[in-house]
């Protein structure tokens, strides 16, 4: 058995799990998420916990049991608490402003960058240089944050660009004569 899949996923109060064939749906206070469970993984619910077992003992099935457990754990955490990712803009004149489903960015280009947020994702700008991405889908929150960072990744000489709040940018020394 996978070491990850050995640990059951505890269901907090207010979170419902439904099975429909291989379709697993998790419903909570913040929304609903769905997952197609691999055919080699068996999911059972007992006393407020979800358990994941590989149907046959081969390596692929054990790996899929662990992967499914991790994905479902993220779904349960997402619908109950949600996920957020914080970005910082470092540079003169770099600004961000959230307007509904569009994030307006001024990143030193000759034109403003307008990023359309996907469904289920919200962005807040507590200050002009901070962006807070929130949502219930961990993968989608991280993907949106990475796409925004890709507009102007931090450069190694001055550190200017869009970076994650907890990111440490490796700095290089300027060329000497």
Swiss-Prot record:
Keywords: Ribonucleoprotein, Ribosomal protein, RNA-binding, rRNA-binding
Keyword flag Cell cycle: no
A Pfam family annotated for this UniProt entry: Ribosomal_L6
InterPro entries: Ribosomal_uL6-like, Ribosomal_uL6-like_a/b-dom_sf, Ribosomal_uL6_a/b-dom, Ribosomal_uL6_bac-type, Ribosomal_uL6_CS
A cellular component term, taken from the record's GO annotations: cytosolic large ribosomal subunit
UniProt key word Ribosomal protein: yes
Signal peptide segment: none
Recorded family membership: Belongs to the universal ribosomal protein uL6 family.
Protein name: Large ribosomal subunit protein uL6
Organism from which the protein derives: Pseudomonas putida (strain ATCC 47054 / DSM 6125 / CFBP 8728 / NCIMB 11950 / KT2440)
Gene that encodes it: rplF
């Amino acid at each position: 058995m996978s070491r990850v899949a050995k640990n059951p996923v505890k269901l907090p109060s207010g979170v419902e799990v439904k099975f429909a064939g291989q379709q697993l749906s998790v419903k909570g206070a913040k929304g609903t998420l769905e997952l197609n469970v691999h055919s080699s993984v068996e999911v059972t619910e007992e006393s407020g916990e979800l358990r994941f077992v590989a149907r046959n003992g081969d390596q692929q099935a054990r790996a899929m049991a662990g992967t499914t457990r991790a994905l479902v754990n993220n779904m349960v955490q997402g619908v109950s608490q949600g996920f957020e990712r914080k970005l910082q803009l470092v540079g003169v004149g770099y600004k961000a402003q959230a307007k509904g489903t569009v994030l307006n960015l001024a990143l030193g280009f000759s034109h403003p960058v307008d990023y359309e947020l996907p469904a289920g994702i919200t962005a807040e700008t507590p200050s002009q240089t901070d962006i807070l991405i929130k949502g219930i889908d961990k993968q989608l929150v991280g993907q949106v944050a990475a796409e925004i960072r890709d507009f102007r990744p931090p450069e190694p000489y001055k550190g200017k660009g869009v970076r994650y709040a907890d990111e440490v940018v490796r700095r290089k020394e300027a060329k000497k004569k």
